[in-house]
Regions:
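Catalytic histidine-centered segment of alpha/beta-hydrolase-like enzymes
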Residues: 184-193
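Serine-hydrolase catalytic-loop signature spanning alpha/beta hydrolases and amidase-signature enzymes
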Residues: 10-18
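Short beta-strand/loop motif that positions the catalytic acidic residue
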Residues: 146-147, 153-155
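Active-site glycine-rich loops that stabilize anionic/oxyanionic intermediates
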Residues: 8-11, 69
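Gly/Ala-rich beta-loop-alpha elbow adjacent to hydrolase catalytic centers
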Residues: 67-75
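Active-site loop/oxyanion-hole signature of alpha/beta-hydrolase fold enzymes
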Residues: 17-21, 30-64, 198
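Flexible "cap/lid" loop of the alpha/beta hydrolase fold
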Residues: 45, 76, 80-81, 86-115, ...
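Hydrophobic, aromatic-rich cap/lid helix
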Residues: 116-140, 158
């Protein structure tokens, strides 16, 4: 099995380093870069998803996808489109229907932030605003029934923006389990890497 990790917007691939180090599958783990996948492409969700799909399609082994925030959206999307390729799915701080008001507010904040903030994560400010704008219409509700693999849904106790949706998602997916990380916020992979790694490894053990 190959374990593919997807970070969130505002993170880099190394956001997963401490988590992966604590698991027993580090040798089979790869952290993908959202910025690299969008390099020389239009900054849209469609382009990002196409590039991510291409990375997954290269794998000949069964895949376990683990994504946080935007990474979770991409992972869920791929599991819907390619259920035969996915052995298991981990969705952290996930949304299955994009919260338009939240995205709009987020984009408004982005406009006031300096370019340097985005550059440290490999993005241009305009590209982040464009990318988030193209996600507003995403809605997977009618397609969730296509997900056939075991799913672990994780959300930080303090991640109020995503907890409700994460719990709802666990209810919609037939073979899923919800886990709340105590004292953690949105960036669970950075805030609670050891606890998250323990939860992930228990899940991985159950699907191997």
């Amino acid at each position: 099995m190959k374990f593919l990790y997807l970070h969130g917007l505002g993170q880099k691939p190394d956001s997963w380093d401490r988590v992966i180090k604590e698991t027993k599958v580090s040798d089979s783990s790869v952290c993908l870069s959202l910025a690299e996948m969008l390099e020389d492409k239009a900054a849209t969700y469609g382009e990002l998803y196409a590039a991510f799909s291409g990375e997954c399609d290269k794998e000949h082994d069964e895949i376990v996808l683990c994504g946080l925030s935007l990474g979770a959206v991409l992972a869920l999307n791929y599991a819907i489109d390619h259920p035969d390729k996915i052995k298991a799915l981990v969705l952290i701080a996930a949304q299955y229907k994009m919260p338009k008001k939240l995205l709009k507010f987020q984009n408004m904040l982005f406009r006031f932030m300096p370019n340097a903030t985005f550059k440290q994560f490999g993005f241009k400010k305009a590209d982040v605003i464009s990318l988030c704008g193209t996600m507003a219409e995403l809605d997977f509700r009618d397609s969730l029934c296509k997900v056939s693999c075991p799913v672990l849904i994780v959300c930080g106790e303090k991640d109020n923006a995503n907890k409700k949706a994460s719990k709802e998602l666990a209810g919609y997916l037939s073979d899923s389990h919800f886990y709340e990380l105590l004292k953690a916020g949105h960036e669970a992979n950075i805030e609670s890497p050891e606890e998250l790694a323990t939860v992930l490894q228990e899940f991985y053990n159950s699907v191997e």
